[in-house]
Amino acid sequence: MLLRVAQRRLTCTPDTAESHVLARQRRERSPSFITFGRHGTLSRVNDSLHYTPQSTPAQPGSAPDRRGLFIVFEGGDGAGKTTQLARLQTALEAQGYTVIATREPGGTPLGEALRELVLKHGSNKVDARAEALIFAASRAAHAAQKIRPALAAGTVVLSDRYLDSSAAYQGIGRNLGKDTITDLSRWATEDLIPHATILLDVPLTDESQRMSHRGTVDRIEAEGADFKARVHTAFADIARQNADGAHYVVDGCGSVDTVHERVLEVVRPLLEARELARDNGCTDTRFTPGGFGEDAQ
């Protein structure tokens, strides 16, 4: 069963100054909106980080990544993210799409080195704040060096984890504050958000059972039941709180093929909208920088 958190329509809107001003006004009224590809400032308010994106509207013709598509798989350890990402990559490549599969932490030489540093299961304890900053550093390199260039080339980018994982694991799991960690991630990526975030929803007991068959686990996967329960709840809460965004909750139970078909139910309309926007030269708010978080008009 697929729960589509956000319903939206495809529209073609002229690239005019007025349309950009109206889009900006809608964004400014929505505190949960994250612009795509903007610079901003990271400040400290009441002992918390606060990110303020630049409010300058995008200029017509300044959307080099219009044709790209950025899809993220999220969920707890054992939810099936890596498996479903690989299945989707195979399916899309069979249809002729250029696809890059990547992961977090990782995706770049720096990111992979940081992944080894922060996830290695050893006796060295990593402070929660240091852990969050390591993930943010990996994500900054990932967005700048791999994801943005791929989107600019019209590539479909599939990522195993992204912003929501830090909000869930470090923000809630480590009790650092979801909003604080989200603002840190937004600053690190210059507000690069996915066109779609697919949360694979699997009961916590099933996740634990799947993990028991892996044999070896990393440092975070080895955390206790209370930590995992907080993270599991956090993912569901994040999807629910982003009801006006591009979050999709997909039932992760069942066979690999069954879950794959559910994932395709999410992805097919996105691909169709992407192709329509490209072929007709229209401004689909889902495929222009700064527009994916707002409802089509």
Question: Where do the language-model regions lie?
Answer:
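A glycine- and Lys/Arg-enriched "phosphate-lid" helix/loop adjacent to the NTP-binding pocket
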Residues: R161, S165-T233
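ATP-dependent small-molecule kinase phosphotransfer cores
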Residues: Q95-T189, R262
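Hydrophobic anchor at the beta1->P-loop junction of P-loop NTPases
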Residues: F73
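Hydrophobic positions on the alpha1 helix immediately C-terminal to the Walker A/P-loop
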Residues: Q84
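Pre-Walker A (Motif I) flank of P-loop NTPase domains
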Residues: R66-F70
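Walker A (P-loop) phosphate-binding loop of P-loop NTPases
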Residues: G78
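Conserved lysine of the Walker
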Residues: K81
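NTP-dependent small-molecule kinase module
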Residues: T41-P64, Q89, T205-Q297
